């Protein structure tokens, strides 16, 4: 019997201002862990899977229950240690220390591969935490919508003279991450055709308003895209089909999308990518019988898809890897030029990272959407001269359905994160907000990740694989007083290809919280500016000087 599977469990985080733990600094991680497993948030909550193939919130249900139990008794001067989803110790620390420290999926580099991890996983000795699954700050697909939106806007500026009108995107994957693409694309003015092999995922995205329409044939989907482009009203279509099949067929037909990318769970060939010609049931059965055969077949299909992406690029499509390591998988399968199209970070996002700009997010522990709308207004008030940001907040309110606890994401940088956090804390203190908020981010941020095929691809100084930076980020956030800190391996791109850290902090209206917020929300993005300045980026060097960062080796 799999201790991770229990279809009878239905987890909903408490709402309101009544505590079930001893303080908000322990109530917050409890509610956010539970929120990760909300049926409208998680991909397979009955299996503790939040998103990204097998990205889990806890190792098994026994561990989940014990984590909740410990958080409810944890004192304000104690720290819970969670090792790959298992609560392993409680230690006396102090009230400015994190209440929870998490380490997920970390392996000694020589053994940092899927084969070794899967053996440990089968024995119940490890858990894949992805990025925000095992660090308890996943907020549904909204968590990646703005980053995807910013990328698509940047692509329009770079390739289409700033206008996406009449343009369409071809992509794959409607899971927890990929599900953001159709909404982000239409918000940026494109029509979007997304291939997905699991019909329940298409239906989930329809229900949560991330996808507009469903199609069961390529002809039907293309007709929907064509009609939308003629009418000038962008549409997103979820096509029930294998991405490798569709991408290759478009090449054969001579049909070239304007933008091509992919966000299937290609990072995990065993659990995350359905081989061509296979049914979901067949794949599930084969995983029990012959894992190596599944991996081989999946990677062969990825090779087909990447070859098609290269052909579409040659035909004129703006083509980018959206961070799922599909190029690496195809390269290992013999596609020698798999890396001829760039990753999205070096191509479109890195200038933002140089200024510490990244996916700042917060959630209302009250469960009241009004608390988010009030914080939206506060962001506009404090950052009045950023129409692009204001437009994002307006679109987010209008078009993004909350999943679980109401939350918001907006990309802001070093000079703004601490200001916003302190303002939110003041709103809790004076009663404008009905309960505290938690503030966190994705691990995909400027100073918190080493991932040579994604966030740190093609660094100016060649330091792509240096992972000291996320380790220092986690240690500094711990020293600065974050409420919980996490250090993971393998998120986004799979085992052996990334190390990254997460941070979450509670704004509970107290003066102690204000001091912690000021430190954490300055230091955390500052490490991103530091990392990019150290790599030689002029934007980061200038930002460091403007913001007065003390970087001893930076020329004054």
Curated annotation (Swiss-Prot):
It comes from Shewanella woodyi (strain ATCC 51908 / MS32). Pathway: Amino-acid degradation; L-histidine degradation into L-glutamate; N-formimidoyl-L-glutamate from L-histidine: step 2/3. The keyword Transmembrane helix does not apply. This is Urocanate hydratase. SUPFAM superfamilies: Urocanase. Binds 1 NAD(+) per subunit. The active site is at residue 410. Keywords: Cytoplasm, Histidine metabolism, Lyase, NAD. It catalyses: 4-imidazolone-5-propanoate = trans-urocanate + H2O. It is an enzyme of class 4 (lyase). Its EC number is 4.2.1.49. It is found in: Cytoplasm. InterPro entries: Urocanase, Urocanase-like, Urocanase_C, Urocanase_central_sf, Urocanase_CS, Urocanase_N, Urocanase_Rossmann-like, Urocanase_sf. PANTHER family: UROCANATE HYDRATASE (PTHR12216:SF4). One of its GO terms (molecular function) is urocanate hydratase activity. Its main location: cytoplasm. Its cofactor is NAD(+). NAD(+) binds at residues 52-53, 130, 176-178, 196, 201, 242-243, 263-267, 273-274, 322, 492. Belongs to the urocanase family. The gene is hutU. It comes from the Bacteria. One of its GO terms (biological process) is L-histidine catabolic process to glutamate and formate. GO terms for cellular component: cytoplasm. The keyword NAD applies. Catalyzes the conversion of urocanate to 4-imidazolone-5-propionate. NCBIfam families: hutU, PRK05414.1.
